[in-house]
Every structure is written in C-alpha cells, then in structure tokens.
C-alpha cells in the first residue's frame, strides 16, 4: 500500500467556543458563541453564514464502534463587530465545551 504523498490538507477552519449567548443575568444555552480563526470583522463573518460546525468529543463508552461523538451545528449570524459568530447546535453544547475547539466546514457553499 502506498503512503500519502505531500502535505495533509485540512478541509475545515478551526474555531473556539467562547460560551453561550447571554445577558447580564441570563444565559441562553441554545445559542453558542464561536470565534473562528482568522476572522476579525463582521464582513468576513458573512461568508461563514449557514456553514456547518462540528463539536467533536471523546466519550467513555463505545457507540457505533467509536469513542468519538459529534454534535453538529450551523453558523446563524454575526455577534458584534470582532468576527465572533452565533451558532445553533442540534443539541445544546455541554459546559465542558467552553474554550474547546470546533470545526467550521466550508460547506454548504453559497458561491
């Protein structure tokens, strides 16, 4: 069997979960704030609207032959002017995901 030729290619951009959307006294766990690497303005966020997110984590018990599980989400809109996005996941992200990495995929494309 032949080995892989050339460099590995990532088909996603890394993002960091900052926390839940919140006000002074309430937090809204159905919406999460994500900082995407290399995105610093509200205009750059517009390209990521509708793109898929994946929070991948490791669980203790095996399901479907794997210890790894995934919660899928979608970028919904910008949050502020500094490149942070609001996103909705199929189930609310667990508290241990704060500060963790998410994958921001390049699809569905709107070009």
Swiss-Prot record:
Protein origin, superkingdom: Eukaryota
Keywords per UniProt: Ribonucleoprotein, Ribosomal protein
InterPro entries with a match to the protein in the record: Ribosomal_eL33, Ribosomal_eL33_CS, Ribosomal_eL33_sf, Transl_B-barrel_sf
Database matches in SUPFAM superfamilies: Translation proteins (SSF50447)
Any GO molecular function: structural constituent of ribosome
PROSITE patterns attached to this UniProt entry: RIBOSOMAL_L35AE
Cellular compartments per GO CC: cytosol; cytosolic large ribosomal subunit; cytosolic ribosome
An individual GO BP term: translation
One Pfam short name: Ribosomal_L35Ae
Alphabetized PANTHER family for the sequence: 60S RIBOSOMAL PROTEIN L35A
Family from the record: Belongs to the eukaryotic ribosomal protein eL33 family.
Protein name: Large ribosomal subunit protein eL33x
